[in-house]
Amino acid sequence: MNFKNIYLIFFQFLKARYNFKKIRKKSIVIYNEDSSQLIADFLDSADYYILDTSLKYINFRILLKSFIKYNFKWKPKFYFYTFLSELSPSYIITMVDNDLKFWNIKKYIKNTETILIQNGWRDNLLDIFSELSPREYNSFNVDQMFLFCKKYEDLYKKYIIGKTHTIGSMRSNKFEYSKNTINEVIFISTVKNTNEESIQIKPVQTVFPLLCKIFKEKKIKFKVLGRTLPIDPSEEKFYRNMSNDFTFINKSKEAHKCYKYIDECRLVISIDSTLGYESLSRGNRTAFFTIRGEDLENKSTNFGWPNKLDDLGPFWTNIYNEDYIEKIIDYLL
């Protein structure tokens, strides 16, 4: 553990709110608050526990117990494993499918069944698979994995021993498709932080001014669906610095509204967002300008990865070419 990581952990523990509650056993644990409500909607409210993995709230009694148990080998993950042991659940479920700590739970807690539900489109550039190597094939264990597609089944099974199932997106599946087409185009923002490295924002800076120009000329209303929650004014400002020829829609805490926005528009445009792939699966006309990996020679951000598809397709391009982008838009409109 390097000095930077030690500092970050120390700072997290300093900010945390502590309690001394005695933990009662639960038959089901939802690992990580992210998307926990989606899982909780299917469960008896009295029968599950949501484990906070952000270290915002720390049970001091569990923390002390983990220090005693693991002493000089202690790492933050051992706090979570000790907490899970105390809860002694029959099932541990997560929608944070790219958390290595979850992949490792079975090494520390034997008498429980782990269930992983894929929550987002993955790559090996900025996501979980960039942290793994062939040496880690079959190094992890998750009992049941519910994934977007067959190709993801093949990918996860390289590293994780367990059963896989294709279900698409659980979140998208929950909300009914209701098409009421309006003559508008919506762009799905992938910008979380305008101070991010250029690898995050460069594709948007490259393609967005062109899109504004195209739809202004076509006299079609162009909208941007924001990404940040809580709402960050700098996200809209980032787009306004490139053009004013669009309407900005802040992301809603109500998940169903995102699907309403994409379902009602004539055309949805995405760089490489999960919502873009969900839009396609819902039968919406969806264009993908997956140009993030072009300069980096990284294929995992290409359209449809881990499938191996051509760089140019009827509704996608992995290469920035203004004429081809306009051709895709004309085809889909």
Give names to the regions the model predicted.
Residues 6-18, 28-172, 276:
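Active-site and donor-binding regions of nucleotide-sugar-utilizing enzymes
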Residues 18-29, 87, 177-185:
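A short, charged/proline- and glycine-enriched loop
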Residues 39-42, 46, 170-240:
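Conserved catalytic-core segment of nucleotide-activated headgroup transferases in glycan assembly
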Residues 53-65, 187-188, 212-254, 298-305:
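Catalytic donor nucleotide-activated moiety binding site of glycosyltransferases and closely related
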Residues 58-64, 124-130, 173-179, 257-260, ...:
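Short, charged, surface-exposed secondary-structure boundary motifs
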Residues 76-78, 227-282, 286:
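Donor nucleotide-activated moiety binding/catalytic core segment of transferases
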Residues 89-90, 143, 183, 263-267:
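Conserved acidic residues
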Residues 166, 239-243, 274-333:
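Catalytic binding pocket for nucleotide-activated donors in carbohydrate/polymer assembly enzymes
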